């Protein structure tokens, strides 16, 4: 139910995080790279720290808290909203419409 992803790489996006959120999993990750943009406002974030000992301590504390609170009513409401939002936002229909609009605008600029 929880996707524990203590990333130390500045990713530009994360398909695994998107798929996890679409499945209704809570994502616990760092705020490095575009992970915040990919997972916000639903992800649970740990501030990235180049001191990996500090990062490990902070991440472990945050993950334990997420495990403890996962089944709370408040968190389950958040997970349901997350799943619904991600499945609408990242569906093939939504993506294809975005590309269509992009190309339509590009054609209009040439005219």
List PLM regions with ranges:
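Short hydrophobic beta-strand element within catalytic cores of glycosyltransferases
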Residues: 26-29
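Acidic donor-binding loop of glycosyltransferase active sites
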Residues: 1-12
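Secondary-structure boundary/capping motif
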Residues: 12-13, 55
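Short alpha-helical segment that forms part of, or immediately flanks, the ligand-binding pocket
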Residues: 17-22, 33-37
């Amino acid at each position: 139910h929880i996707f524990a992803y203590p990333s130390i790489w500045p990713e530009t996006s994360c398909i695994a995080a998107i798929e996890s959120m679409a499945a209704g999993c809570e994502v616990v990750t760092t705020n490095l790279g575009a992970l915040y943009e990919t997972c916000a406002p639903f992800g649970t974030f740990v501030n990235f720290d180049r001191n990996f000992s500090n990062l490990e301590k902070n991440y472990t504390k945050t993950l334990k808290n997420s495990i403890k609170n996962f089944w709370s009513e408040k968190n389950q409401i958040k997970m349901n909203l997350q799943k619904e939002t991600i499945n609408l936002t990242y569906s093939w229909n939504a993506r294809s419409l975005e590309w269509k609009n992009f190309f339509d605008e590009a054609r209009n600029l040439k005219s």
